[in-house]
Amino acid sequence: MKHLVFLIAVPLFAQKLAVLPPSVELTGPEARQQLLAQSTSGDFQEDWTRTAQWSSSDPKIAAVDEHGIVHPGERDGEVRITAKANGIAATITVKVQNARAPFTWSFRNHVTPVLTKMGCNSGACHGALAGKNGFKLTLRGYDPEVDYDTLTRQAQGRRVSLADPTQSLVLLKPSFAIPHGGGKRLPKDSLEYRVIAEWIAAGAPPLSNKDAEIRGLEVFPAAAALKPGAEQQIVVRASYSDGHTEDVTRWVKFSSSNEGVATVDDWGRVKMNGSGEAAITLYYSSRVLYSRISTPFPHQITSDRYEKYPRKNFIDDLALAKWKGLHLAPSPVADDSTFLRRAFIDAAGILPNSEDVENFLADRSPDKRTKLIDRLLERDEYVDYWSYKWSDLFLVSTRRLNSTAMWTFYNWIRHSVAQNKPWDQFARDIFLSSGSTRQNGALNYFVLHKDTIELTENATQAFLGQRITCARCHNHPLEKWTQTQYYQMANLFARVGVKNGNEPGDNVIFAKASGDILHPRLARPLAPAPLDAASIPLDSLEDRRVKFAEWLTSPTNHMFARTVVNRVWASLMSRGLVDPADDLRATNPASNEELLAALEKDFVEHGYDIRRLIRTIMNSTLYQLSSAPNETNAADDVYYSKHIIKRLSAEVMLDAMAQVTGSPTAFGGYPAGTRALQLPDTQVKSDFLASFGRPPRILCDAAERSSDPTISQALHVINGDTLNKKLSAPDGTIALFSKLGLSDRRILDHIFLSAYSRYPTDAERDTMLAALEKTRLVKGTDEARRDARRQAIEDMVWALLTNKEFLFNH
């Protein structure tokens, strides 16, 4: 009898080991470099640094300890450092130079980072606006020159004692040799103590033009997918203007964007706590970077489940790649009713009417969704809706503009949306224009922001997604922007002039020939320069706005396109790839960086076409997914494996109630039938809109529009005059039912199609038909029975309009 052997196919992944950084140069006797022994097997990485066996081919050139820290030996040269772990090995070459050269710690590059790491110059300590106990440092060491003067020349020289460094207050207090309100921060046996002590012993050398300046940071690993519960060491290396590099890991400030997924300690050791992704943010010497660390969800998903996902465009490809890495399975595609309602709301801010729904549900053509999207993007309501959105962004209201200026600004925005003006042209039309605000509505942007500081901060947040306000007073604590960059940027707008026009309420915008804004500490103007760009001479007669507009709309300025792409994505998908949608700082990375980069690239390559961007997103399967969770994605509200439910905005909700009931909302001073989304001004009184979060348009901040639930909202919905009056309106839809003599079944179909974009279920229909049938049994006159029937219909419509299915976009 033959023996049968069954072979089970199991995916085998060859484990690979690498040493990071892949190349190392040690410069000077104090150079150190933490190495990582990092393995890769399949989709996962693993940190073997603490258990690996480390060896050097020549310890006299460079030695490596059991922790993987390599340091110079007795002479210069090259050496091979090897790590062995789990039966495999990896080797890198380390170059050593100036191993025995004289060395002095730098105040800028060593002492200041030590003070920052210890928290001495934090906002809670001596970096506070008023300092602590008469000792004030600049926040996180943003101005080393000022800090040097404070340490060495103030307090009668007691903070730094050149005669006996150990008696320096800067050592005595943080080491707790004498009482210190901040506690023990600086153990005497620490490297940090030695850095400060040896710097003082060397004569406390000041800052010098010969000091190497930091040019950038590298992080290792830049990204890693780890197993649940795993740990990972992060290593940060700084590069300097003289070409040398330094391991600055121990002086970096670390934080995690999602501590439910991963936490990080003071020394860069990451611990995985849950499933998903976390950005480990690194702050060092006014520079920020992050490492993306992830752990997949604990789901076993077969490959065919991903293969069945219908990919329509690059959005689906990149979303699918993210889900695979995180072990998330997408929800199915939403049914036609859900998609139809969602598309109408997201593209045009309205509900489909009952005829729209019936026609769409009856349509059997395979491309009906694509055709619907195309039709929606050509409707007047699309123009109303997106004009309203951009008016929110640009703060159009009579709060700060007169009525004429408000209307001309709004009409300019609406005309731009109607003609699908490219976004780069939209920006140029604002920043490059001069003349009368009556004749050119875009110029009212400068009337709104007459103050140079306000104009600078609004422009950077509206068009670049950068909140630079902190840098007005000091280097940004959470971003790379410095105070110097802030005032260089502000000086681009210092010569924007505003004067009265020839007609009442008119203003004229012009470029002044002179005028600068002063750096508050330096007490002098700085050469104007966009963020991270070259400056222009202070004495140049060129309109500085030209330089700004050219830089702003350049395809190489990724912040510009990235910001508006993320805003549009957030509007359609309920959450930005970067969230909040207007906070695109480096320490707030996208949930799918590859997808955002691809959207930005596609947007730029197709001429900054907003309508095309919306069409691209809405045509993706990703946009059309159901919001109903499956067994893998119930907890996902970040990676779009299911559609994210959102409450209707105040204006959309009010207009939808008016649409379903056939009773338009009256707005004082506006023609009958004006919808909330057609109002150019948020100062138009409406308690309902105010209660549901209509923004006052004071600040350029996505948080101005609130979606938080309140008691006031509940009262408006449950028993408010706004809805009750619409239900009982004598010329509304419910009154029309009686006049037309529609059957109960047809009435139910109509109200469900109008409110929910679907037919009632059998259970809903049976319950409501029974309720309507009871009205026929009311004793008394025919009029009493008609009144009872009308009241029953009002109650049914009220029940539909106060239900979550109506109040939310699914």
Segment roles from a protein language model:
Residues 307-668, 699-700, 704, 724-792, ...:
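Primarily short, surface-exposed interaction patches in extracytoplasmic proteins
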Residues 23-30, 58-103, 108, 112-117, ...:
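Solvent-exposed helix-loop boundary motif
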Residues 116-138, 198, 202-210, 467-482, ...:
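Periplasmic/extracellular electron-transfer cofactor-ligation site
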Residues 13-17, 205-216:
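Proline/serine/threonine-rich low-complexity linkers at boundaries of modular beta-sandwich domains
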Residues 46-59, 195-203, 246, 250-260, ...:
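Short, well-ordered beta-strand segments
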Residues 3-12:
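Sec-dependent N-terminal signal peptides
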Residues 796:
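Globin-like tetrapyrrole-binding proteins
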Residues 39-43, 238-242:
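Short solvent-exposed capping/turn motifs at the termini of beta-strands
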